[in-house]
Amino acid sequence: MQTLNRRDFPGRSHPDKIIQFGEGNFLRAFVDWQIDLLNEHTDLNAGIVVIRPIDTDFPPSLSTQDGLYTAVIRGLNEQGEAVRESRLIRSVNREINIYRQFDEYLALARDPNIRFMFSNTTEAGIAWNEADQFSDAPPSSFPAKLTRLLFERFEHFSGAADKGWVLLPCELIDYNGEALRELVLRYASHWQLPAAFTQWLTENNTFCSTLVDRIVTGYPRDEVAALQAELGYQDSFLDTAEYFYLFVIQGPKELAQELRLDKLDLNVRIVDDIKPYKERKVAILNGAHTALVPVAYLSGLDTVGQTMDDVQISSFVEKTITEEIVPVLDLPEDELLSFSQAVLSRFRNPFIQHQLLSIALNGMTKFRTRILPQLLTYQQQQGKLPPRLTFALAALIAFYRGERDGQTYPLQDDAHWLERYSTLWNGVKHGDIKLAELVNTVLSDTAHWGQDLTAVPQLANQVTEQLQTIIDSGMRAAVAAYS
């Protein structure tokens, strides 16, 4: 079977216009996939040079396949139909290992065609390292590497205003563009680079904050043989992802034209502020995940897919989103409902087996960040508590008993909560404390919640009553009132 390469698989090629820090699965099934579509359907004509930002030879370089690889996109489309598309991605030209090819890396700065920078160096990537020096080849941190590259460009083109870049980091931190910009400016100061360089950075380079959303399941180990037989070639960089994707960019409106987004209907939004979109994702997608996990797991289910196939639990999830989360969010209702439907389709994706216990990791923190804001806003706006969100809290407390149908299961959270719940539930079991006392202890932990939740009118009483029903009647019977 042939291995992918451009000689045996000829097709479109594009000049280098994009530098990408990060060779991982996510960017390849997200940014590179979108650029490939734009190259095919518009005159963007942009090739990508991938920079491997860490010193490792594993996995092998994309250059071993001349930058070619296959993206397999699968899930439920807008009509609820299961779809699968295999696409040979030609947008990546080559990969550079910055630790072996530093001169080739710096040469990119001298290419007048380079215009865009994308990155995904993980949440830990946009960080300061005091030890990084300008003379390092390369410096260790991503922002320092980028600063060195930008200075090379500034010098080569004598600070030309039209040679700045549009920088679009995709790391999962708030306002990632602003964070990256601040660190680049900090390195410029730390290294005592000319003031003219700092001025060029701020005036002629555009750092955009982004929000990225797509579940990328990566290399499909269990299906490789079947997929390669179907494709007719060997591909060491197969990459799988869900059907849904969303790319929100906080940046100038002209960016849509420059990226040719006005010529192809991709799910990319250029906005003035990404914050409402971040809140929407956290509240609806992540919030629904967090709400459903203890309810579904204690109802005898193990995956998100099983949850959505279960009439009772899926009804609970849908009503939680549409009746208690969406009404308190600050975006147009039609956008919120459309996003909600997309989320439910994603949960139903038959190609992804998402284990509930893996999502349950750090459930207490997830409840605080993903659900509590909507619970409190609902209570303030409506003058009453949202019954399903409080039920989700009661279910979460029940989940930390660590027992389902007489069998124990692993709990993953910080030691503080694991020890505390173990003590509290043992106290209830042996009659040393009442259920109301357990609930009050959990809700009054101001260090965790940022406030004393027992001060929220009726919250402790409502959660205690719901928890009592779960204990007495079982989750199935208890959730029936909210489905």
From Swiss-Prot:
Catalysed reactions listed for this entry: D-altronate + NAD(+) = keto-D-tagaturonate + NADH + H(+)
Keyword NAD belongs to the record: yes
Organism annotation: Yersinia enterocolitica serotype O:8 / biotype 1B (strain NCTC 13174 / 8081)
GO biological process terms held by the UniProt record: D-galacturonate catabolic process; mannitol catabolic process
Listed InterPro entries: 6-PGluconate_DH-like_C_sf, 6PGD_dom2, Altronate_OxRdtase, Mannitol_DH_C, Mannitol_DH_N, NAD(P)-bd_dom_sf
Enzyme Commission number(s): 1.1.1.58
Sites where the protein binds NAD(+): 18-29
One Gene Ontology cellular component annotation held by this UniProt entry: cytosol
Annotated pathway: Carbohydrate metabolism; pentose and glucuronate interconversion
Highest taxon listed in the record's lineage: Bacteria
Entry keyword Oxidoreductase: yes
Protein family (similarity comment): Belongs to the mannitol dehydrogenase family. UxaB subfamily.
Alphabetical UniProt keywords: NAD, Oxidoreductase
Protein name per Swiss-Prot or TrEMBL: Altronate oxidoreductase
SUPFAM superfamilies in UniProt: 6-phosphogluconate dehydrogenase C-terminal domain-like, NAD(P)-binding Rossmann-fold domains
Gene Ontology molecular function: mannitol-1-phosphate 5-dehydrogenase activity; tagaturonate reductase activity
